[in-house]
Structures are given as C-alpha cells and as structure tokens.
Amino acid sequence: MKKLGTLFVLFLSVIVLVACASGKKDAASGQKLKVVATNSIIADITKNIAGDKIDLHSIVPIGQDPHEYEPLPEDVKKTSEADLIFYNGINLETGGNAWFSKLVENAKKTENKDYFAVSEGVDVIYLEGKNEKGKEDPHAWLNLENGIIFAKNIAKQLSAKDPNNKEFYEKNLKEYTDKLDKLDKESKDKFNNIPAEKKLIVTSEGAFKYFSKAYGVPSAYIWEINTEEEGTPEQIKTLVEKLRQTKVPSLFVESSVDDRPMKTVSQDTNIPIYAQIFTDSIAEQGKEGDSYYNMMKYNLDKIAEGLAK
C-alpha cells in the first residue's frame, strides 16, 4: 500500500507539472499575454487588435530609428519574458547592426514559435539594383494594403496563443482593417486627380517605394536607406540636378531623420519643404500622426496637398 501511495503521489505530481507547462496565458487563466513589438507602428496595430487583453511593450521609442538601435536593459528583460514577439522583418531590424537578431538569440527565442515577422505575405520591393536577400526595402507599412496584411498576421498569432479571446481579436481585426481599407481607397482616388508632371514624392530617405507603387506617385530621395551614408554632398548634388529637370512643387522631410540635408536641397532648388511626414515611427500621443491610421492619413493628406500646389 505504501508503494501504491507513493506511485499515486508521483502520478499526481506529473499531472500538475504537465498542466502548468501546457497552460496558456489567456482569459481562462487570468493572465494576460506578454507581447513585445519592435516599434511604435507594429505596437499600435497590435493594440488596435488586442486592446486590454495583453501586456504590450514597444522596443524602439517613438521618433527613433528602428534600422539601427541599441536595446535597453528593460527591452532585454521584456523580450526574455515575452510570450509573443512581433517584428517587421524584410531587412528592418535585422539589417544594419542586426540588433533584433542579437536580442532574440540572447533571449533564447525561436522564430515562428516565439517571434513572428508581421510582413509575412507582403510583395517585397528591393533596394535599387539589389534584388537579393538582405537588400529588401523594409518600409512595407507605407502601403495601407500591407498594413492590413500586418494586422491579419498579428491577429492570427494572438489567436493561436490565446484561443479564448480569438473572437475578440477577430472582431477588432475586421473593424480595424475595414477602416484601413476605406482610407486606402479614398487616397487612391485623391492621387488620381493630381497632374502627372507634379507627381513626385521627394524625401530624405528612399522609404516611399511601397507608397509609390500603391498610389501611383514616383519617388526620389537623398539617400536610399538609413543604414547607409546620409546626406553626403554627392547625394545632395545628384538629387538637386534631378529636381531641376522637374516641375515638382513641394519637398517633404521625415520626422525621424535630420532635416538639414533636405533644407540644403530646398535652398539649392528653390522648392519649398511643404511638410514633415512620418516613415519609421508614429507621433507622440496627442499629436498629429499618433497612431498607424493617423500617421498614414496625415501622410496621404499632406503629400496630396503638397503635390497639388
């Protein structure tokens, strides 16, 4: 009997351990999923789908460059503890100094189990003349159709980790993507009415290739991506010479870059900088562009206004 009692205790212990190990952090357990997003854009899309069902940490601060970043001790801790990690992929956080690759490796996280690229399924555009892995243009979110892909990928992984809240996530996803889709369609109509000779988006970084393809507006830039030299005299000279051959009425400068190179271009061409726009980050809470939807609406409105001058 003593032997049987011992075996029963061991059996019960195993059952308890298995139950603890297999339990999901969902509404049933009373625990929220711990979710990490690499930047403010992905964090905002996640928040629109998950609401208060998760504990969310965004790594790269608002207004900072996600191409090359040095994670803080808090970022390392949050990543190590995370149930789910969302990153952009396509050469954003894994290009440059590869800060994200190092972060998840040190946190002992596994791709497609613990961390997921929200850009999965996007029709990738490459940097000019560099159609190869590691040379992808990462700025897919600047096409609202890709923002919808991001949202669907996020909702899919949230539902997989937290099935008890699947209906909640799917309801929010539908409402959110309908809103993005409406803005996308309205914006395409708006750009169709701008004269062809004025259609050129001029920015500091060449981040608007996805935007250009979506809304039928070519783009020009000083430098192609933030991981290369930025605003050299040769880069500025090349753009100035190009702009002198056009009738483009306005220039734009991004919120997360040094505006001095674009000011030089403006002075040399007598083309005014019409507005500051958003690429790699949303704005601070309470300011124009303080969500993914708001930053895209702001960009689309300002670019259309500037090119219609």
Swiss-Prot record:
**Residues bound to Mn(2+):** 67, 139, 205, 280
Q: Which Pfam family name is an example for this entry?
A: ZnuA
Which residue numbers carry lipidation of type S-diacylglycerol cysteine? 20
Per UniProt, subcellular location reads as:
Cell membrane
Q: Which UniProt keywords apply?
A: Cell membrane, Lipoprotein, Manganese, Membrane, Metal-binding, Palmitate, Signal, Transport
> What do the Gene Ontology cellular component annotations say?
plasma membrane
Q: Does the keyword Transcription regulation apply?
A: no
The way it spans or sits in the membrane comes to: Lipid-anchor
Where does the UniProt annotation place the signal sequence?
Answer: 1-19
Q: Name one GO molecular function term.
A: metal ion binding
Report which superkingdom the organism of origin falls in. Answer: Bacteria
- Which residues, per the entry, are lipid-modified as N-palmitoyl cysteine? 20
Q: What is its main location?
A: membrane
Q: Name one GO biological process term.
A: metal ion transport
NCBIfam families per UniProt: ABC_lipo_SloC
**PANTHER family, from UniProt?**
HIGH-AFFINITY ZINC UPTAKE SYSTEM PROTEIN ZNUA-RELATED, METAL-BINDING PROTEIN HI_0362-RELATED
Q: Which family does it belong to?
A: Belongs to the bacterial solute-binding protein 9 family. Lipoprotein receptor antigen (Lrai) subfamily.
Described purpose of this protein according to its UniProt entry: Part of the ATP-riven (ABC) transport system PsaABC involved in manganese import. Binds manganese with high affinity and specificity and delivers it to the membrane permease for translocation into the cytoplasm. Also acts as an adhesin which is involved on adherence to extracellular matrix.
What name has this protein been given in UniProt? Manganese ABC transporter substrate-binding lipoprotein PsaA
